[in-house]
């Protein structure tokens, strides 16, 4: 089925960002169902989307349904299948923050800069402004640490094994900043644009730098970190702004 992805994309008039998103979703779908497309494998695929947001689910189901129709038209499938993409969102007066399935953030992508920005927020809780100021000299990949200096002092953060490969690739160039623009940092808007394009490509357009930072907080809390420890990791003067996450 994977062989049909590129002809399918060529048959549609898609912007580059949308094309990358379609390709990612369809490769993921084909890897999961293999060559056996039937009601059972499609049901299992739908179940695998249960940890995603409503918007991400609808996007993936819509993409796959279009692909299934294309396969039927091309006689690659003898039967026409269509998954139910009607998803009812659950609403409450007080939205509850939950930890997300972030496996898609680590998958292969054409949006490498946006991906690394997202991972630095998700894994280290950094803000776009802090990321803009990161220099290659701040990283010690051998010791797996980042030393971030600010007016409040130096924060030493551990780099996870999952994050290291992305940093190793990004720090190969001879430059001053991690994201370098003629030995100067890029603008704040540039970082938001890169992040937005990456999030859209993985079907998470509703997320933002702030919501990824909240995921960092929730993950650290789940790992057993105290509110004081998380405040220190984020470089906060006080843990007051974190109280709502620890009352959940």
Curated annotation (Swiss-Prot):
**Which GO biological process entries does UniProt record here?**
DNA transposition
User: Sorted alphabetically, which keywords does the UniProt record give?
Assistant: Cytoplasm, DNA integration, DNA recombination, DNA-binding
Q: Which residues form the Tyr recombinase domain?
A: 92-248
The protein's location, in the record's own words, is:
Cytoplasm
GO MF annotations, alphabetized: DNA binding; tyrosine-based site-specific recombinase activity
Give Gene Ontology CC terms: cytoplasm
Superkingdom in the source lineage: Bacteria
Where would one find the signal peptide in this protein?
A: none
Task: Name the residues annotated as catalytic in the UniProt entry.
Answer: 213, 245
Xref: CDD domains: INT_StrepXerD_C_like
Q: Does the keyword Oxidoreductase belong to this entry? A: no
Function, as annotated, reads: Putative tyrosine recombinase. Not involved in the cutting and rejoining of the recombining DNA molecules on dif(SL) site.
The name this protein carries in UniProt is: Tyrosine recombinase XerD-like
Species name for this entry? Streptococcus equi subsp. equi (strain 4047)
């Amino acid at each position: 089925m994977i062989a049909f992805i590129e002809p399918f994309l060529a048959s549609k008039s898609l912007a580059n960002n949308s094309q990358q998103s379609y390709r990612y979703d369809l490769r993921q779908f084909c890897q999961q169902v293999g060559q056996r497309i039937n009601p059972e494998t499609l049901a299992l695929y739908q179940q695998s989307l249960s940890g995603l947001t409503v918007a991400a689910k609808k996007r993936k189901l819509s993409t796959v349904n279009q692909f299934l129709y294309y396969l039927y038209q091309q006689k690659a499938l003898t039967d026409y299948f269509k998954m139910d993409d009607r998803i009812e969102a659950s609403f409450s007066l007080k939205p509850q923050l939950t930890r997300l399935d972030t496996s898609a953030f680590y998958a292969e992508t054409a949006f490498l800069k946006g991906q690394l920005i997202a991972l630095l927020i998700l894994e280290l809780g950094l803000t776009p402004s802090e990321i803009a100021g990161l220099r290659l000299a701040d990283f010690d990949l051998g010791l797996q640490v980042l030393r971030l200096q600010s007016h409040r002092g130096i924060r030493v953060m551990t780099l996870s094994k999952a994050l290291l490969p992305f940093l190793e690739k990004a720090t190969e160039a001879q430059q001053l900043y991690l994201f370098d623009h003629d030995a100067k940092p890029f603008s704040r808007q540039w970082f938001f644009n890169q992040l937005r394009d990456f999030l859209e490509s993985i079907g998470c357009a509703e997320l933002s730098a702030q919501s990824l930072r909240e995921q960092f907080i929730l993950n650290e809390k789940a790992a057993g970190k105290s509110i004081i420890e998380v405040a220190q990791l984020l470089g906060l003067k006080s843990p007051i702004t974190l109280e709502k996450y620890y009352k959940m």
